[in-house]
Amino acid sequence: MTIVGWESKYREILKDFGYSRKKDNQSCKLLNSLLPKKMRITKIRDLIENKPVFVIGAGPSLPFCLSVLKKHKKITKIVADGATKAIIENGLKPDIVVTDLDGDIISLKKTGRTNTIMVVHAHGDNSEKIHFVKNFKNCIGTTQTKPMGRVRNFGGFTDGDRCVFLASSFKAKKIILLGMDFGTRIGKYSKITVA
């Protein structure tokens, strides 16, 4: 699945940031080769379709959102990479983690050994980390370029974007953003360097 209009946005991103389509394709190909033969996309559908979902980012408001998450444990939690550490440190379990593997790798590996679905994104700058998918029990692959084999393109550029696009693609009844701050402050769980 590729969202309508994504290709033109992707070309703009390549141009604006100086990224390489060739490297994105190589990383996608590598990810595809490491994914399990049977990809259970229906597991994601069962968690999202016609249900409210929390999309959780690593913004500065995340610590204040934890009480809401603890109060509503049964609502599906789609967690952006950087927020994973905060979620598991507070005794919560992500249902889905969307990651390009630049967050806290210890937290990602720990979560990846559970039933959490790890949605791993391949791009030109993370090919050296793609092998981590072998440690994940339930893994789905995504790309920002043309999908191939078992690797999909649901849209989005950041982990947080991809969480929202994933929820939308699987027809969530309602998408509730937590820890997704649109200001200039970076949360303590976000990566330090910004592209």
Where do the protein language model's features map onto the residues?
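A short secondary-structure junction signal
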Residues: 65-68, 109, 129-132, 151-153, ...
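Acidic/Gly/His-enriched mid-domain segments of enzyme catalytic cores or analogous surface patches
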Residues: 73-76, 82-173
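Glycine-rich N-terminal segment of FAD-binding domains in flavoprotein oxidoreductases
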Residues: 56-61, 65-69, 76-88
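Short, basic, glycine/proline-bearing loop/turn elements
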Residues: 49-55, 69-70, 145-152
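A generic local structural motif
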Residues: 39-43, 62-67, 104-106, 162-164
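Short N-terminal helix-initiation segments at or just after the protein's N-terminus
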Residues: 18-23, 60-61, 116-123
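Glycine-rich anion-binding loop/nest that anchors nucleotide
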Residues: 55-60, 159, 174-188
